[in-house]
Swiss-Prot record:
This is Chaperone protein HscA. The lineage of its organism: Bacteria, Pseudomonadati, Pseudomonadota, Gammaproteobacteria, Enterobacterales. Disulfide bonds: none annotated. Belongs to the heat shock protein 70 family. Pfam families: HSP70.
Amino acid sequence: MALLQISEPGLSAAPHQRRLAAGIDLGTTNSLVATVRSGQAETLPDHEGRHLLPSVVHYQQQGHTVGYAARDNAAQDTANTISSVKRMMGRSLADIQSRYPHLPYRFQASENGLPMIETAAGLLNPVRVSADILKALAARASESLSGELDGVVITVPAYFDDAQRQGTKDAARLAGLHVLRLLNEPTAAAIAYGLDSGKEGVIAVYDLGGGTFDISILRLSCGVFEVLATGGDSALGGDDFDHLLADYIREQAGIADRSDNRVQRELLDAAIAAKIALSDADTVRVNVAGWQGEITREQFNDLIAALVKRTLLACRRALKDADVDPQEVLEVVMVGGSTRVPLVRERVGEFFGRTPLTAIDPDKVVAIGAAIQADILVGNKPDSEMLLLDVIPLSLGLETMGGLVEKVIPRNTTIPVARAQDFTTFKDGQTAMSIHVMQGERELAQDCRSLARFALRGIPALPAGGAHIRVTFQVDADGLLSVTAMEKSTGIEASIQVKPSYGLTDSEIASMIKDSMSFAEQDVKARMLAEQKVEAARVLESLTGALTADAALLSAAERQCIDDAAAHLNAVAQGDDVDAIEQAIKNVDKQTQEFAARRMDQSVRRALKGHSVDEV
C-alpha cells in the first residue's frame, strides 16, 4: 500500500470525462493563463490575440479594470492604478515601505500591521488586488474553454516564504478558484521542457523579467525537483535595458528637457521598439521627437553589458550557495521576455558552458509548465500516468540526541517533495552517526513510528559540532521515501529507501494525528526538558575536554568554582526542572567565560608563532 490510496483533489469519477484545468503564471509585470488541449499545452490569448495580461489593476468608485486598459491609466491616475502587487504579497507594511520607499500609493496599516492601499474603491490589500488579476485570467480561460475551471496550478517564486504562498492561495480562493497546487516557477519552466522525466542532475533556471532577475539552481532526482539555491536582483530587469537605451537616444537626439512626459513616453516607446528589433537585426532606424538616426546591436550591447554581468554575478553566488560548479549544470532554462536579447543568451551560454534552452517562448514557459501539471492533477491523465498520492499523511523526520524527533517534512506536504536539513556531531572525535528515520506527529521518538535505521561512517574526527552532515529526505510520486546523509567536507554518504506508511491503515494514521493533538501540551513540555538535558550533557562534555587539555590556565580557586558549577549542573540535569537546568547551564557559562578567553588567546599565540605580521 502506498502512503494513501486516494485520488487527487476533485478527481473525476468518470475517467473518460475531461475536466477543465489551467496553469497560471501570476507575474510581477505580466501574467498568463495556459491549458492543455489535444495533448498540447498552450497559453490563452484575449480577444485581440494578446497572450500577456499586464499585472495592473485600475480602481474607480464604480468598479475596476485589469490589464492593458488599467496600465493606460498609470500616468494619469497613479494612486488608483496598482502594479507590481506581487512584491507586496505576504509582507508587512513596514517591510514594504523599507524595501520599496518610492511606491506612489497611499498606505494604511491594518490591525495586524499588514498593508492596506487607499483607492477610489476603498481600502484594498494585496490579496484583493491579486484576486482581481486572477479573476481576469480565469474569465479568459473559462470563455476560451467554454466552461468553469475545475482547478488551477499557480506558480510562485522559489524563494516565496509561507506567508507569501498563503497570500497567493487566499487570493485564488477570493477569486473563486480551486488551487490544485502552488508550483515553484523554476520547476514549472523545467517541466515545460520535459526535464522532469529526463536525465537526473542539476538544472539552472535563468529568469530575467521586466522588473526583476531570479536565478534558481535545482537538482532533479527520482522525479523530484529540489531547490538547492536561489538568488537574483529584485531591482534589475529588462525595463533597465529600455531606460538605458532611451537615455542614449535622448543624448544622440540632443533632447535636454526631461520634464515633458509626452517626450519621455515617446523616447521609452522608441527604445522598447529598438530593443525588440535588435534581437533579429544588426541595425535599426529610430525616428523620435524630430530626430532620425541608427542604432546598432553593438552599441546596444555596450549599454547593457554591465547589467548582464550583474546577473552572472548573481548566478555565481547561487552556484556557490548550492555548492555546484558551472560545468556540473546539465541544462540552463531561459525564462522571461528579456532573455530574447542576444547578448544575454550569449553571455549565459559562455558562463555555463552550454547552449541555453530557448525553444519555448520565454514569456510563456512558466505558464505552460503549470498547465501541464494542472492537467495531471485535475485527473485528465490515463490511470497508468495518474498520481495516486497527493500529500504526506504523517510527518517524516529524524531522532536526535535526547530521544527527540526533528521533523524534516511536515504532514500534508504535497508530493513529490525533497527537503534537506543540516546536523552535526555531539562528541569530540565522533566518526560515525546513526540515522534513525521516524514517522509521526509526537515530539519524542518513543511516541513515533520507526521506519528505518542506517549509519554514516567515515566522518572526519573533529571537535563536537565541527562536522556538518546534510540529511536529505525525498518522497517521489509513488510515496517512496529516500533518505541520504552526506558529510559535506568529504562527500561521503549513505542512504536508504522505505515506503513510509507501509502497513498503516487510514484509521491508524488518524489515530496518530489525534494523539498528537491530545498530548500536544504534554509533548512540548517533554521536548523542552529533553532539549535542556541534551544541552547540559553537551556543555559538560565540552567542559571536561577543555579542563583535560588546559587546566594549567586556571588557579586552584578558579578550578574549584568551575568544578562546583559543573557538579551542580550534573545534579539538576538528572531531575525534571527545566528552569533549574537552564539556570545551571547559564551559571557554568558565567564561571567559564574567563577560562574560554584564555584558551582562545593561547590558541591565537600558537597559530601566530613563527609568522610575521605581514604574513598574517
